Design a protein with these regions (language model features):
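Class I Rossmann-like S-adenosyl-L-methionine
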Residues: 1-187
Length: 187
C-alpha cells in the first residue's frame, strides 16, 4: 500500500496525541477518529497500525532516530517495523530527511543492547533474565512487540462455532478455536 501524504500527516498527528500517554492509546485513537470523520476505513487502519507500531517499538525507534519527533518516529516505524521502502514514503519526506532515513535503512539493530532491541526498560529486561533466562526474556520481549490476535465470541444462539470457523477459513482468514473458551475463535 502506498500511503498518501494526508495519511502520513494524520498518522503523525495521532502519534503526537498518543505519545504523552496521558490516556490509553485506543481511547486517544477513538477520539482522534471521531474528530476526523472524513478518514476512510483504509486511512483509519493505516493510522491505527502506525500509532501502535510507534508505541510498541518506541524505545528502539528513539534510539535509531536523532531528535525523535512524532513525524520522524512515524517514518522510522514505517521503514524499520512495517517494512516500507523509502520510495513508498518519499512524498512525505523533506530534503533534510534523506540522510537519516538512508542511515536508518542500514542501521544494525542486532548491534544494540537486547533491552533496546525489544523496547523494554533496562530494569525489566534485567529482572526477566534474572528470574527466567535470556532466551525467555527475549521471547517475552518479542511477543510484546507483536500485534495482539483478535478473539471473537460466537453467539451460540444463532451460530455454531465449527460453522463460523469453516466460514472464516473459506473467506481466507487464519482462524482457530480458542484454547480456553468453547465458543471463542482466534483470528
Amino acid at each position: 500500500m502506498q500511503p498518501t501524504p494526508a495519511m502520513m500527516q494524520a498518522a503523525t498527528a495521532a502519534v503526537d496525541l498518543a505519545l504523552p500517554m496521558l490516556h490509553p492509546a485506543d481511547a486517544v485513537l477513538r477520539e482522534f477518529f471521531s474528530t476526523n470523520r472524513a478518514l476512510g476505513q483504509r486511512d483509519r487502519a493505516f493510522i491505527a497500525e502506525t500509532v501502535f507500531s510507534v508505541l510498541r517499538h518506541k524505545r528502539l525507534l528513539e534510539q535509531l532516530v536523532a531528535e525523535p519527533t512524532p513525524r520522524k518516529l512515524v517514518c522510522a516505524a514505517l521503514i524499520k517495523v512495517q517494512g516500507f521502502g523509502l520510495g513508498q514514503i518519499e512524498t512525505f519526506l523533506k530534503s533534510s530527511d534523506r540522510d537519516w532515513t538512508l542511515a536508518l535503512r542500514t542501521a544494525d539493530i542486532e548491534a544494540l543492547p537486547a533491552a533496546v532491541r525489544l523496547s523494554l526498560p533496562d530494569w525489566l529486561y534485567e529482572r526477566l533474565v534474572a528470574e527466567t533466562s535470556e532466551q525467555e526474556a527475549t521471547a517475552f520481549g518479542r511477543a510484546m512487540l507483536k500485534t495482539a490476535p483478535l478473539d471473537l465470541r460466537v453467539n451460540t444462539l444463532t451460530a455454531d462455532r465449527g460453522q463460523v470457523l469453516r466460514d472464516l477459513r473459506a473467506s481466507g482468514f487464519d482462524a482457530a478455536p480458542t484454547r480456553f473458551s468453547p465458543v471463542g475463535i482466534r483470528v
